[in-house]
Structures are given as structure tokens and as C-alpha cells.
């Protein structure tokens, strides 16, 4: 009863912004190699955070916290959408400057890598990771292969596509068609990406395939007496292509003194979205030329208790599938699905 109370966990960014009591793992600040190593670890951590979608403000706080944890308090951090630069100097009589530059890789939503970096940051701030240990662990995190192969990623996106169709009010047949369409566009994007095709054209190709596939499935369903909603097939394919894009990051960067990165993220989002719209438009026109046009948009009835329950379950499965597609471990997948289940239940049953 009177035992020691367990400290509640804090978010990493809150830990990072807390003032350090003292250098936890100090290094020789008069050594150019030691200072460069500290800046290299901090820059690598910032590189992973930015690539995972962390805003510049939060990433800068964590980079500064890492350098201060090793006793390097005089460090300037310059972050943009494509580059991170750290400036400091050797604490000797000559004060020779030290600069470390890292070029940002293409944004990749790898939740497992982000979680490992989060653990590394906590270990550095708590003194459990020396500089040598941090270098080795960071290198292992950056060079580690994806925890999920292409087949697993495609299957996760297929599950997401089918679940989103149920979330939108579709039936089982529409969900099955959306599952196949999502897998097709994600597989096509992965193949084109490996060949070096820019993301804009990947999304054009994905949108084109989604529209043509939806038209083909709709007319094939008419032959066997099934009335499918091709609009749902196209919508779920678009969600699969654009699931990683958000305006929240752009706006957050814009209001947190990072206008360059905010504008870059905003333009990037608009350009890639335009690629999907162009691909879908081309696919619709090609379907008309092939005499298999798409029907007008259908209206969906208001949800009742049964359909609302299916939508809630669809939202939970879609959230869990997205987390798995982003390489999250199974515990995180379960938490993601449970969170979506609670949120969807509140929305459909209480509001």
C-alpha cells in the first residue's frame, strides 16, 4: 500500500523538451571525432523521424535533446523537407566548427522503425545508451530490411480495401471487388516504384487501373445478375494510394515556424493527389471508348443498427490493416484496431 509509486510513461517529445539535469553520458567535447559522432547520431535520428512524417518542430526538439544528453549544448539544428543540418564546434581554444548534413530519404511510413528510434531516444536520454551503443543501434535500425515482404504489404492493403468498402456501406461483393482492386494498384505501384518511376506517375497508373477495373467488374456483375457499386471500388483504391498523405503535417509545420517544409508538404500532397485524379479520369474516358461506361453515382441509404455495426467493424479492421501495412508489430496493430473500434462505436451509436 505504501510502496513506491510507478512513474507514468511520457511521450518522447515531452521527455525531449524537459530540461536535462546534467550531461547523462558526456563525451570529450575537445575531440573533433567525438563531437562529429554525437552530431551524426542526432542527425540520423532526425532523419528517421522526418522520413516517418514527424513535424520539424518535434523532430528538432528530440535532436537537440539527444545532443544535450551527451553534453553538447551548443548545437544549431536546421531542418527542411529534404535536408537536416547540424552545426556545432569543438570546445578547445580554436573553436573549430563541425557540420553534419543528412539528405532526407523518400518518406516511408515504417511504424516499427519509428518505435525502435523512439526506444533509442529514451535510452539515450536516460543514460542507458552510450555513444558507441547508440551509433551501433541507429545503424542497425536504418539498415534493417523491412519487417514485412511485398506479399504481406499487398495483403494488408487488400484487407484495408475490403474493410473500407464495408465502412462506406458496401455489400460483400463490392468489398470483394475492392479487395482485389486495392491489391492490384498497390502491387502495380510497388513494381513501378522499383523501376524508378516517380510517385506522380505511379498514382496515375494506379488511378487508371482502378477505374478500368471497376468498370469491368460492374459490367461483369450485370452479366451474372449482380449490381455492384463501381464508385466504391474506385474510392477504396484511391484511399489505398493516398493513405499516407495528409494536410495535417503541412499545416502543423506551417504554424510551428517551418513554412518551407509546410509549403513543400502541401505542394507534394496536391501534386500526388492530382496524379490519382488524372489517372481515374483517363480510366473513365477509356472505359467509355471501350463501350463499358461507368454508371451514375448511387445513393446510399442511411445506416441502421445492422449496417452501423458492420461499418464499425469495417473501420476497426481498416485501421488495423493500415497499421500492419505500415510495418507495425501485432501489438500496435491490435491497439490501432481497438482504438478505431471505440471511435467508430461512439460516432455511430452515441452521436
Task: Name these PLM-found stretches.
Residues 108-115, 119-351:
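Alpha-helical transmembrane segments and their membrane-interface boundaries
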Amino acid at each position: 500500500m505504501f510502496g513506491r509509486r510507478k512513474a507514468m510513461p511520457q511521450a518522447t517529445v515531452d521527455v525531449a523538451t524537459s530540461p536535462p539535469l546534467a550531461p547523462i553520458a558526456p563525451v570529450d567535447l575537445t575531440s573533433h571525432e567525438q563531437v562529429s559522432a554525437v552530431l551524426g547520431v542526432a542527425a540520423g535520428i532526425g532523419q528517421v523521424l522526418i522520413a516517418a512524417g514527424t513535424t520539424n518542430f518535434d523532430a528538432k526538439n528530440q535532436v537537440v535533446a539527444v545532443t544535450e544528453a551527451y553534453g553538447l549544448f551548443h548545437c544549431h539544428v536546421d531542418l527542411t523537407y529534404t535536408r537536416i543540418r547540424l552545426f556545432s564546434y569543438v570546445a578547445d581554444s580554436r573553436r573549430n566548427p563541425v557540420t553534419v548534413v543528412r539528405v532526407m530519404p523518400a518518406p516511408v511510413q515504417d511504424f516499427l522503425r519509428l518505435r525502435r528510434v523512439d526506444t533509442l531516444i529514451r535510452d539515450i536520454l536516460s543514460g542507458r545508451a552510450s555513444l558507441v551503443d547508440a551509433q551501433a543501434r541507429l545503424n542497425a535500425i536504418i539498415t534493417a530490411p523491412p519487417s514485412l515482404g511485398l506479399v504481406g504489404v499487398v495483403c494488408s492493403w487488400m484487407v484495408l480495401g475490403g474493410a473500407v468498402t464495408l465502412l462506406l456501406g458496401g455489400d460483400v461483393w463490392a468489398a470483394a471487388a475492392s479487395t482485389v482492386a486495392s491489391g492490384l494498384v498497390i502491387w502495380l505501384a510497388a513494381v513501378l516504384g522499383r523501376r524508378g518511376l516517380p510517385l506522380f506517375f505511379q498514382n496515375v497508373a494506379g488511378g487508371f487501373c482502378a477505374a478500368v477495373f471497376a468498370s469491368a467488374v460492374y459490367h461483369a456483375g450485370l452479366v451474372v445478375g449482380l449490381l455492384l457499386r463501381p464508385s466504391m471500388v474506385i474510392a477504396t483504391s484511391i484511399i489505398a494510394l493516398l493513405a499516407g498523405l495528409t494536410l495535417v503535417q503541412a499545416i502543423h509545420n506551417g504554424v510551428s515556424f517551418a513554412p518551407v517544409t509546410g509549403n513543400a508538404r502541401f505542394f507534394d500532397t496536391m501534386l500526388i493527389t492530382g496524379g490519382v485524379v488524372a489517372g481515374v479520369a483517363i480510366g473513365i474516358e477509356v472505359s467509355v471508348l471501350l463501350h463499358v461506361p461507368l454508371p451514375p453515382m448511387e445513393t446510399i441509404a442511411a445506416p441502421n443498427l445492422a449496417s452501423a455495426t458492420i461499418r464499425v467493424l469495417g473501420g476497426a479492421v481498416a485501421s488495423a490493416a493500415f497499421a500492419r501495412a505500415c510495418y507495425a508489430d501485432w501489438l500496435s496493430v491490435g491497439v490501432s484496431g481497438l482504438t478505431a473500434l471505440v471511435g467508430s462505436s461512439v460516432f455511430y451509436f452515441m452521436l
